[in-house]
Amino acid sequence: KYAVVGFGTAGYHAVKKIRELDKEGCIDVYSNTGRAPYNPMLTTYYAFGKLEYEGMFPFGDLEQIQKEVDFNLRREQVIKVHGSEHLVETENGSEQYDRILIATGARAFAPPVKGLEPEDAFLMRTVEDALRFKDRLKKNDIKHAVVIGASMAGIKVVEVLHKYGIETWLLDLASYIFPLAAYKEVAKEIEKRVEAQGVHLMFGVTIDHMEQENGEKTAVLTDGSRIPADIVGLCIGTRAITETVQGEVEIGRGIVV
């Protein structure tokens, strides 16, 4: 009897492999999203309009996946995994298993920004994030935007905003774009191309707080600069979701294996 906690891409592939190795075993998959597994990097493509909604779900819909792989989907929030007891505790009770796999993934990380209204703050990782972002863009009430984080997700959000004709600033505390993914020489070439599209780049700086006066919203930066900002995209990074196994396994920036 197997339990898989989390049903993103990793959870999906784990379930497929378990079923391949054990044709008869019971597999319970815990997921509180109610959605098929999806690729978080595809959410910006949907927001841009390059993908239809279904395109975010590369493995098909839930009904199709369940039919192909044969598992039980339990739409419950897992509260705690008790490793020594082989127990999964949920909001509705608990269940014992022979083997438990943790595939909870990560969530977007965003520190609070003083003065930033919730309706003007946008993350970009989940399907819900993409739907919310797209709905706001349809209102045509955004003239200026600030995106924090010169990451892959950040530049894709900038691309979406640029498509809608929104004047956009991309900020990062690092000294150049894609600091974790590109050599400085390559990054500088990318920066030239991004700026050629009319995007403003600012490095070594981030947002300090938001101010609003007479309906005009302004992002005040850590160097004192002031930028008009109707919305703020927070693409700073992710944090591993480890709450369910706290105290049960060794945890660093994620689960240590």
Regions found by a protein language model. Name each.
Residues 75-86, 203-215:
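A conserved short coil-to-beta-strand element within the FAD-binding core of flavoproteins
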Residues 144-145, 152-211:
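Rossmann-like dinucleotide-binding cores of NAD(P)H-dependent redox enzymes
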Residues 8-12, 34, 106-108, 128, ...:
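Residue-level detector of alpha-helix initiation sites
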Residues 1-70, 158-181:
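Beta1-alpha1 glycine-rich phosphate/pyrophosphate-binding loop at the start
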Residues 1, 75, 139-144, 204:
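Phosphate-coordination loops involved in phosphoryl transfer and adenosine-cofactor binding
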Residues 117-138, 218, 226-257:
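FAD-site-proximal beta/loop scaffold in flavoenzymes
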Residues 90-99, 222-231:
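Core beta-strand elements of the Rossmann-like FAD/NAD(P) dinucleotide-binding domain
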Residues 104-164:
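Glycine-rich dinucleotide-binding loop and its adjacent helix/turn
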